[in-house]
Amino acid sequence: MTDKTSLSYKDAGVDIDAGNALVGRIKGVVKKTRRPEVMGGLGGFGALCALPQKYREPVLVSGTDGVGTKLRLAMDLKRHDTIGIDLVAMCVNDLVVQGAEPLFFLDYYATGKLDVDTASAVISGIAEGCLQSGCSLVGGETAEMPGMYHGEDYDVAGFCVGVVEKSEIIDGSKVSDGDVLIALGSSGPHSNGYSLVRKILEVSGCDPQTTELDGKPLADHLLAPTRIYVKSVLELIEKVDVHAIAHLTGGGFWENIPRVLPDNTQAVIDESSWQWPEVFNWLQTAGNVERHEMYRTFNCGVGMIIALPAPEVDKALALLNANGENTWKIGIIKASDSEQRVVIE
């Protein structure tokens, strides 16, 4: 025998009991997201999911993302209940622009010291995002890593798999001269540009919890969860000939719209067709941000842009509005050999 103290994993900063308590806390909300194709429950070494039988030539579509430094703002303000929705939204919105129906989602939650209440709030938000998008939360990893993160700081990442009929993949190849562009309004900055947001808050000396904008704290505008467009867009795709969809994330208008444009086409955006939500006006003014930089960093009130034939526009707007989306005609596609793929005028 030795007089040395017997060390445990908990002494090293990893509390397995806290991890088990978290699993017990989240089981109920995770179960609500279950799709009929999912086989087995939580706790297996891998999650099993069958393909929906309605697909003749199913193609799997995958995506992974995080929420950037919006997470830092959420931690600073101690508001953890909606950041999980952001995480799901960033993944599933990227899938649906290709016509894919999200099937299942997995998350990765890493922290220096596991706080069960905080982690439970985040994962409950992830489950809510999965409910909004119709996909199952089938598993995840909670990693308590002392020395890797400061205190109870945490990071999250998500991974999603969806499915689309091979013949119905939306890849922008059908976009042509004369197509109309319609916009789907955003709920705010979504999950992009937050390093600039935080810099503006720092330089301006503004407290987002006490500064009011449109009758509510600025923090509410900045932490509004990213809108999930999946169910509205999937119904639209079923009933309307959609040529392309762009999800306006990092890179804003200048970089995301060209991703779905064929060669020799140009998107012409009518800046007078909408008014920026006040949060973007505040950011531009408080940070003295140039117009071009605003459109490169933020969505400026536009979460998605959809290209479709002119005769389909009225039907598309009616369908989207009926599903609660804020939509409008934002521009057109023109034939052009210009290197400038997007024009805002």
Swiss-Prot record:
Keywords recorded for this protein, A-Z: ATP-binding, Cytoplasm, Ligase, Nucleotide-binding, Purine biosynthesis
Catalytic reactions of this protein: 2-formamido-N(1)-(5-O-phospho-beta-D-ribosyl)acetamidine + ATP = 5-amino-1-(5-phospho-beta-D-ribosyl)imidazole + ADP + phosphate + H(+)
Domain of life: Bacteria
Residue ranges the record marks as coiled coil: none
Species, as recorded: Shigella dysenteriae serotype 1 (strain Sd197)
Cross-referenced Pfam families: AIRS, AIRS_C
Enzyme type, top EC level: ligase
Primary location recorded for the protein, binned into one broad class: cytoplasm
Name of the protein this chain belongs to: Phosphoribosylformylglycinamidine cyclo-ligase
Primary gene name: purM
Family, per entry: Belongs to the AIR synthase family.
Family matches, as SUPFAM superfamilies: PurM C-terminal domain-like (SSF56042), PurM N-terminal domain-like (SSF55326)
GO annotation, cellular component aspect: cytosol
Biological or metabolic pathway of the protein: Purine metabolism; IMP biosynthesis via de novo pathway; 5-amino-1-(5-phospho-D-ribosyl)imidazole from N(2)-formyl-N(1)-(5-phospho-D-ribosyl)glycinamide: step 2/2
UniProt record, GO biological process: 'de novo' IMP biosynthetic process; adenine biosynthetic process
Keyword NAD: no
Lineage: Bacteria, Pseudomonadati, Pseudomonadota, Gammaproteobacteria, Enterobacterales
Subcellular location: Cytoplasm
Gene Ontology molecular function: ATP binding; phosphoribosylamine-glycine ligase activity; phosphoribosylformylglycinamidine cyclo-ligase activity
EC number assigned by the record: 6.3.3.1
Entry annotated with the keyword Metal-binding: no
